[in-house]
Amino acid sequence: MRSSSSRQPQMQSYYAIATVWALIIGAATYYFFSNSKPKAVLQRGDTAFKEFPLIQKTVLSHNSAIYRFGLPRPSHVLGLPIGQHVSLSANIGGKEVLRSYTPTSSDLYDKGYFDILIKTYPQGNISKYVSELAIGDTMKVRGPKGNFVYNHGLVESFGMVCGGTGITPMYQILRHIAADPADNTKVNLVYANVNHDDILLKKELDAIAAENDNIKIHYVLNNAPEDWTGSVGFVTKEILEKHCPPPGPNTKLLLCGPPPMISALKKASVELGYEKARPVSKLEDQVFAF
């Protein structure tokens, strides 16, 4: 018969091995769960600005570019619900200036960075400031914010009308719908610009429309080339009626663009039977202006 003293080293060895395995399993479990849901850098309700470095600039035209800002870690996401925007801040001429932008990137598949499409205006404060940033320079960002959040099943169909950089929230929603095989939401987008070269993200938009039967895009130009097949001039009530879905309980009309354009579209939408848009849009509104 073995003595208890002879069994003691065996028991100690057993406990040591069990402890090591417990630590390994615990570490693996922590790693799995900590990496299964990427950490969101921004949280709704945050009042403090966070700084992010510019890591890439992709020029789209003579006055527009996509600016890519890096997040603290490659596994991080910005923390932006679909349809929301962020505020950029900079000290310009001794004053703190803020502007809102909708990132074109998405938490769904863009990790470690976020993209913002900005058109630079001669008298623009933030847009000019960002255009002069060098790689490695930081930008102050706060958010997310906004009254619109897209989730699968929100509506059966969208009418979207935008001008210029007003494409950014529409693109974010379109990209999300196109990435989800189960999302069959119908989208009719009317995108207006002055010149053909002003059409932002056209290659990406055309690719989305070509690969998704539920997404249709119609372009409008003020100054159209001779071989142009889209509409010419401003977005009229007739264009809205022809290329957007009729008003209904499962339809929303989304608007984003210059104030005069939005004002005209709100009036035209009422004439077509849509509910009158409120001064500040809410998610439940039939007509939502970003």
From Swiss-Prot:
Function: NADH-dependent reductase for DPH3 and cytochrome b5. Required for the first step of diphthamide biosynthesis, a post-translational modification of histidine which occurs in elongation factor 2. DPH1 and DPH2 transfer a 3-amino-3-carboxypropyl (ACP) group from S-adenosyl-L-methionine (SAM) to a histidine residue, the reaction is assisted by a reduction system comprising DPH3 and a NADH-dependent reductase, predominantly CBR1. By reducing DPH3, also involved in the formation of the tRNA wobble base modification mcm5s 2U (5-methoxycarbonylmethyl-2-thiouridine), mediated by the elongator complex.
Family that this chain belongs to: Belongs to the flavoprotein pyridine nucleotide cytochrome reductase family.
Pathway involvement of the protein, from the record: Protein modification; peptidyl-diphthamide biosynthesis
Residues covered by the FAD-binding FR-type domain: 47-151
Binding site for FAD: 131-146, 157-189
SUPFAM superfamilies xref list: Ferredoxin reductase-like, C-terminal NADP-linked domain, Riboflavin synthase domain-like
GO cellular component, one term: mitochondrial outer membrane
EC top class, as a word: oxidoreductase
Localization: Mitochondrion outer membrane
Organism, scientific name: Yarrowia lipolytica (strain CLIB 122 / E 150) (Yeast)
Record text on subunit structure and interactions: Monomer. Component of the 2-(3-amino-3-carboxypropyl)histidine synthase complex composed of DPH1, DPH2, DPH3 and a NADH-dependent reductase, predominantly CBR1.
Gene that specifies this protein: CBR1
Keyword annotations of the record: FAD, Flavoprotein, Membrane, Mitochondrion, Mitochondrion outer membrane, NAD, Oxidoreductase, Transferase, Transmembrane, Transmembrane helix
Descriptive protein name: NADH-cytochrome b5 reductase 1
Listed EC numbers: 1.6.2.2
